[in-house]
């Protein structure tokens, strides 16, 4: 990877609204009659930011780390995905300078809770609120009222000499360690039996 002082990443995600599931956006549960369909919790904002962070250091995308259809990530908190992207960013020798996002959805209205959502995302990223921007637009005249979309751009700055990006074998080890943590939590909190480790199948298809 070129030893540039700054790099830019772009991320995009979209999900269809679905009845009977909670609406998760920006790490928050919003009061709305429908949620977003997805294998995980469908958090369109965190997914877009995650892909932007991974893209900034050319580390792949969500599907590279969390294979589509893997039952381990069914209804998973998208903060898990974001944390892994931050680890990749740190490994490459970079940190978040700022994040700019635009949500596109007909409802619910985001502006009344944008400040709270910014605070939540900033906390997840480990940055100040002045480094996170969350805007919202409506898809007027596009017949997309049944869909939520998010565009995210991140600027990252180098804080140390970049290390060599992880090999696929190292990525597998990271995923296994993460899965072990999830298994422990499920076992301790919900009494779910631990699952055997299986060799992950990598696919760039978006699982979310």
Each model region followed by its residue ranges:
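Pyridoxal 5′-phosphate
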Residues: 134-135
């Amino acid at each position: 990877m070129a030893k540039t002082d700054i790099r830019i990443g772009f991320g995009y995600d979209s999900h269809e609204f679905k009845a009977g599931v909670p609406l998760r956006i920006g790490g928050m549960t919003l009061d709305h009659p429908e949620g977003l369909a997805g294998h995980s919790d469908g958090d369109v904002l965190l997914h877009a930011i995650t892909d932007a962070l991974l893209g900034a250091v050319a580390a792949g995308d969500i599907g590279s780390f969390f294979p589509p259809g893997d039952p381990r990530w069914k209804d998973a908190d998208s903060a898990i995905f974001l944390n892994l992207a931050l680890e990749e960013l740190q490994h490459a020798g970079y940190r978040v300078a700022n994040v700019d996002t635009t949500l596109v959805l007909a409802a619910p209205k985001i502006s009344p809770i944008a400040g709270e959502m910014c605070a939540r995302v900033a906390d997840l990223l480990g940055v100040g609120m002045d480094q996170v921007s969350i805007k919202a637009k409506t898809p007027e005249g596009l017949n997309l009222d049944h869909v939520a979309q998010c565009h995210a751009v991140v600027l990252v700055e180098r804080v140390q000499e970049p290390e060599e990006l992880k090999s696929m074998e190292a990525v597998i080890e990271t995923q296994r360690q993460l899965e072990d943590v999830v298994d422990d939590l499920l076992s301790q909190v919900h009494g779910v039996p631990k699952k055997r480790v299986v060799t992950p199948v990598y696919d760039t298809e978006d699982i979310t």
